Curated annotation (Swiss-Prot):
Gly residues composition bias: residue spans: 175-187
Top-level taxon: Eukaryota
Region spans: Disordered: 162-210, 350-429
Assembly: Component of the PI(3,5)P2 regulatory complex.
Record's compositionally biased regions (Low complexity): 188-198
Motif (L/FRRG motif): 309-313
The entry's keywords: Autophagy, Endosome, Membrane, Protein transport, Repeat, Transport, Vacuole, WD repeat
Listed Polar residues bias regions: 162-171, 405-421
Protein name according to UniProt: Autophagy-related protein 18
Membrane disposition: Peripheral membrane protein
Biological processes annotated in GO: cytoplasm to vacuole targeting by the Cvt pathway; late endosome to vacuole transport; pexophagy; piecemeal microautophagy of the nucleus; positive regulation of vacuole organization; vacuolar protein processing
Signal peptide coordinates: none
Length: 568
């Protein structure tokens, strides 16, 4: 039986309603976030997110370590943990859940770390190889040799095909024509005809994975005419930038799975990567390093760095980064138990007056800044640190319209004390208080908020007298919204996705008040009101789904709307 609970008020005092009866070995969303696949010690299960319902349960069998769906079709890829006799973590099975049949199976030379599916490709990641298959015929198209990647870090963009993705996992999608089998990494011979899963003629699917920590790899790509970190720079500049950082391990290779050729190398971080994600249309790449303090967003076509956000001050393990379907937000989860939401591409009018002035002067003074700060840049880039001082790294020079760092992302709590009736700094628009969850208020949080506010005010005063590179240290771009996962367990891993469709939900009236106008009585706390929210779905390794509401106008603290348990 499925266990579910609507969050009580205040929401963050809720406790998990039931401990799942079976260990969760693997949990993930499908490509559009409409379903959740869970692998456990008895098999695997599939749930829909809205509404939360179990729509498929596999027959009891071997423990499953990986389960991946193709949108909401009946095609499922599973890999066993290999704990039972006859099962192996090197064996991949493609299953038609509607027919209950195995379409084909493939055996690889080493343990399978990750599987990714698009409408046209299947990507199988091993420790030192990546296999690319045509999903309609299961023909091996290409093999990529990589550096050791035990963390299984890779990302793929969903090609823009015309597959019907209804919310029913029982929808066969015309995938599979009956049982078939194969063995060996390149011997898949099953024919999986599909009338509605053929990608559009202009669709593109990109694969992103860590670059080997060798300059020879970059040099070979340059010889082949591949861009490294931007198409606007010359090969000489690219080679110089690589040779100056021979120990870089945070670069990302973008690979075109249609042409089967590398597209570019993006210099994302100096330290090792912890998580990467491609937007569904393949235009943007988000990255986080193992330092866990900085999140960056790049243009895939040019390699230019478009956004840089401060996730936190102290290092932590980042579990996942994900784009919203409309590319307006980036969602990150980490070992701290906090989920951060960063906003992309807000209107220029949301920028503060000082940021606009610096942006307008950037092209005029870039030559002087480069000359004046070259020595400092070299020192900072040589230290290998990706924490606080990493903000001083030079940004790629791109048009201001393309970058558009959002004012709302600068600090969710900056205007909390001003009230909704306060005017913006330029006197044109009223400030809107971000949502505040009073259950999350603590002395440490208030002190941190005050120090950030003072820091931003100091940066605004000094910004006109400092080059933009130095000003970015004092005035980092922070999250637009955040939430604290309501799990009682520690060391819980999590992943999250954000739905870009606005939903009207009933929430406590207390969330409409500013800090100074917080409701004083329990009766006021229980009163409900309707709010237009975006839903954030968070799943945790202890077997729970949390649904939070994000106010797209105010940001701030997200509201816990639902809590469900995978009773498997």
């Amino acid at each position: 039986m499925l266990k579910s609970q609507i969050a009580p008020i205040p929401s963050y005092e809720s406790q998990p309603v039931h401990k799942p009866s079976s260990s969760v070995n693997f949990i993930t969303f499908n490509q559009d976030g409409s379903c959740i696949a869970v692998g456990n010690n008895k098999g695997y299960s599939i749930f829909t997110t809205n509404p939360f319902t179990k729509c498929y349960d596999s027959p009891p069998g071997e423990a499953i370590g990986i389960v991946e769906m193709l949108y909401s079709t009946s095609l499922v890829v599973v890999v066993a943990l290999g704990e039972e006799t006859g099962s192996s973590p090197r064996k991949l099975k493609i299953i038609n859940t509607k027919r209950g049949s195995t379409i084909c199976d493939l055996v690889f030379p080493s343990t399978i770390l990750k599987v990714k599916l698009t409408r046209s490709r299947m990507i199988v990641l091993l420790e030192e190889q990546i296999y690319l298959y045509d999903i309609s015929t299961m023909k091996l198209l290409h093999t990529i040799e990589t550096s050791p990647n035990m963390a299984g870090i890779c990302a793929i963009s969903a090609d823009q095909g015309s597959t019907d993705t209804s919310n029913s996992a029982d929808n066969s999608g015309s995938i599979g024509s009956g049982p078939a089998s194969g063995s060996g990494a390149g011997s898949g011979s099953a024919s999986m005809t599909s009338t509605d899963s053929t990608p559009d003629a202009q669709s593109h699917s990109y694969l992103a994975y860590p670059s080997p920590p060798k300059t020879a790899m970059h040099d070979s790509l340059l010889v082949a005419g591949i861009n490294t970190n931007g198409g606007s720079h010359s090969k000489q500049n690219n080679i110089q930038s690589v040779s100056n950082a021979p120990n870089r391990v945070g670069d990302v290779i973008i690979f075109d799975t249609d042409s089967l050729q590398p597209l570019c190398v993006i210099e994302a971080h100096k330290s090792a990567l912890a998580a990467i994600s491609l937007s569904s249309d393949g235009r943007l790449l988000a990255t986080a390093s193992d330092k866990g303090t900085i999140v960056r967003v790049f243009s895939v076509s040019t390699g230019a760095k478009l956004y840089q956000f401060r996730r936190g001050t102290y290092p932590t393990k980042v579990y996942s980064v994900a784009f919203s379907p409309d590319n307006r937000y980036v969602v990150t989860t980490s070992a701290s138990g906090t989920v951060h939401i960063f906003r992309l591409g807000e209107d220029e009018s949301l920028e503060s007056k000082h940021k606009r002035k610096r942006a307008s002067r950037q092209h005029e003074t870039i030559a002087e800044e480069t000359s004046a700060t070259q020595d400092l840049d070299d020192e900072i880039e040589d230290d290998g640190d990706d924490s606080d001082v990493d903000d001083v790294e030079s940004l790629e020079v791109v048009p201001s319209k393309q970058r558009k760092l959002s004012q709302g992302s600068s600090n969710s709590y900056t205007s909390m004390n001003s009230g909704i009736s306060g005017m913006s700094e330029d006197g044109k628009e009223p400030k809107i208080d971000p949502i505040v969850d009073h259950a999350r208020l603590s002395v440490a949080r208030m002190i941190r908020r005050s120090s950030q506010t003072l820091g931003r005010k100091a940066a605004q005063k000094m910004g006109d007298f400092l080059p933009s590179k130095f000003a970015s240290i004092l005035e980092p771009t922070r999250h637009f919204a955040s939430l604290k996962i309501a799990s009682a367990s520690k060391d819980v891993k999590s992943i999250a996705v954000l739905d870009s469709q606005v939903v009207h939900d009933m929430v406590p009236q207390m969330f409409l008040h500013s800090k100074d106008a917080a409701p004083a009585s329990a009766l006021d706390t229980q009163s409900m009101t309707e709010m237009a929210l975006l839903h954030i779905f968070v799943v945790t390794s202890d077997g729970y789904l949390y649904v939070y509401g994000l106010d797209p106008e105010r940001g701030g603290d997200c509201i816990l709307l639902q809590q469900h348990s995978f009773d498997i």
